[in-house]
């Protein structure tokens, strides 16, 4: 059911991109361009989603001799989860955050910021890395990257057309264009894309948290890490293209009155509460083994 829901939401994002092209560019030409753009965006996201996301945050590939402790922790967790070793990247930022990307476990990558490596104790770092491995195991990375790429394409299209209206008005559109519809789409298309992203991202964070907690056996360590990361994000948010925010373990802060509606993640406190509840369950059943969720 979750896979069907995700496929439906990605289909709606593609349809939104096609509809946006029709409304923004005008007429049948806009429709044809939208279909082509949607096809190219999905194909590009399939093959290059990892590089697109990593480039968005200027992540730099690191070798085992450059980050031996990071490699050792990820390798141990990957073996425990029966996953291939992902490529590891470090983001040159003092903000504390992390994400995973890649179309499948064989093409996966994990990126962490310099700030996260400096800030977290060993057990909490392990929890964060396990969370990212959980996204890889649960095949969330491709879904999130495709959604981010589609949303980014919609936002870019709307922005380009808004510039066109600003400088040239509606004179450049053909007879089939609808200036009022185009103006509405400039506002509504990116907003709708964001809302569809929410439907894809929110439930996956809970699942990745639980998978990570079972993998490490330390739900409290991940809960403490989330608390630290949330506090850090309020003071020092990681920049980058907002379309890729759903990939991050902690959502960048937004205005308080919009937070519940437009955040791509469930609230950090809800995630912490679930982890602490899971800790109680694991303590009552100490022999429970890690399983793929």
UniProtKB/Swiss-Prot annotation:
Its protein name is: Protease HtpX homolog
Where it sits in the cell: the answer is:
Cell inner membrane
Q: Which Gene3D superfamilies does the protein's record reference? A: Metalloproteases ('zincins'), catalytic domain (3.30.2010.10)
Name the residues that bind Zn(2+).
Answer: 131, 135, 205
Q: Could you list this entry's UniProt keywords, alphabetically sorted.
A: Cell inner membrane, Cell membrane, Hydrolase, Membrane, Metal-binding, Metalloprotease, Protease, Transmembrane, Transmembrane helix, Zinc
What would be an example GO MF term here? Answer: metalloendopeptidase activity
**Pfam families in the cross-refs:** Peptidase_M48
Q: Which family does it belong to?
A: Belongs to the peptidase M48B family.
Q: What class of enzyme is it?
A: hydrolase
Q: Name one GO cellular component term.
A: plasma membrane
- According to the record, how does the cofactor bind? Binds 1 zinc ion per subunit.
Q: Which cofactors does this protein require?
A: Zn(2+)
> What's the main place this protein lives?
membrane
TM segment ranges: 7-26, 30-49, 148-168, 180-200
GO terms in the biological process aspect are: proteolysis
Entry's EC annotation: 3.4.24.-
Native source organism of the sequence:
Acaryochloris marina (strain MBIC 11017)
């Amino acid at each position: 059911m979750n896979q069907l829901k995700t496929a439906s939401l990605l289909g709606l994002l593609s349809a939104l991109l096609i509809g946006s092209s029709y409304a923004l560019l005008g007429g049948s030409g806009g429709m044809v361009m939208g279909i082509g753009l949607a096809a190219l965006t999905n194909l590009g996201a399939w093959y290059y989603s990892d590089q697109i996301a990593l480039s968005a945050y200027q992540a730099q590939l690191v070798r085992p001799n450059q980050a031996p402790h990071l490699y050792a922790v990820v390798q141990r967790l990957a073996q425990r989860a029966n996953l291939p070793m992902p490529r590891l990247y470090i983001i040159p930022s003092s903000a504390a955050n992390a994400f995973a990307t890649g179309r499948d476990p064989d093409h996966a990558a994990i990126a962490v910021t310099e700030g996260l490596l400096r800030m977290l104790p060993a057990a909490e770092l392990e929890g964060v890395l396990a969370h990212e491995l959980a996204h890889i195991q649960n095949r969330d990375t491709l879904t999130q990257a495709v959604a981010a790429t589609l949303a980014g394409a919609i936002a870019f299209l709307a922005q380009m057309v808004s510039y066109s209206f600003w400088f040239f008005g509606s004179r450049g559109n053909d007879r089939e264009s609808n200036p009022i519809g185009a103006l509405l789409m400039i506002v509504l298309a990116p907003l709708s894309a964001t809302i569809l992203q929410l439907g894809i991202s929110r439930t996956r964070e809970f699942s990745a948290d639980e998978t990570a907690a079972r993998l490490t056996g330390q739900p409290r360590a991940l809960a403490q890490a989330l608390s630290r990361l949330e506090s850090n994000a309020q003071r020092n948010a990681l920049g980058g293209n907002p379309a890729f925010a759903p990939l991050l373990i902690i959502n960048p802060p937004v205005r308080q009155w919009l937070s519940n509606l437009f955040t791509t993640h469930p609230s950090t406190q809800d995630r912490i509460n679930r982890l602490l509840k899971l800790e109680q369950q694991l303590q009552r059943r100490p022999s429970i083994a890690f399983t793929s969720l």
